[in-house]
Amino acid sequence: MHRSISLRRCSIAFALAAALLTWPAAGYAELGGILPPPPTTTTGTVLGNASAVQATILGMTTVLSGTGSIGSNDALDASVLTGGVPSTLTAETLSASAISYADEVDSAASLGNLSMTVAGTGITADFVMAQASQVAGAPGSGSSTLTNLSINGIPVAVTGAPNQAIPVPGGQVIINEQTISSTGTAVVNALHVVVTGVADVVVASATAGIS
């Protein structure tokens, strides 16, 4: 059993590293590891942060593996092997990173073995990741990865399209939630569960903006 858990964690780490290698500027960044030094000059306003989990339950907010906000020519990361929100969520290998360059900001967050129950709705996934990027002068972009997502034991067909919504009692689950601001800042939430008046849970969130 220990070997199975170790292999699963290695697979998650490999998938995350492979995804980061597709980014022009963040190819050398590894979530939960040492980030490369950014260039020495950045112009404009920088927005960047990431978190593995941000859960607000009955007005109480918990953040797991959150980077906080980056500044110009900055790099932040956060990771833990296991984490959870009491009576709501458990997960493994929670990681987040954000980095700013002279003309680009990249951020990403991920976790594995997600199991959560929000207002009676059970949600599981083997792997969840969000990534966002913006190059100065161009609109930001991002994507999400969700592996073996199930809601109340029923497998969910993840389309890959932004803002795929699934109704649940009292609210909805939004998959690959994406917003692009007027300045091009990209915000990507891989999984967003909202139950009105009870809970607002975001799993794997990444923000990247430079203007």
Positions of the model-derived regions?
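Bacterial N-terminal signal peptides that target proteins for export
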Residues: R3-F14
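Conserved binding-pocket/active-site segment within a compact domain
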Residues: G27
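Extended, solvent-exposed, non-transmembrane regions
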Residues: E30-S211
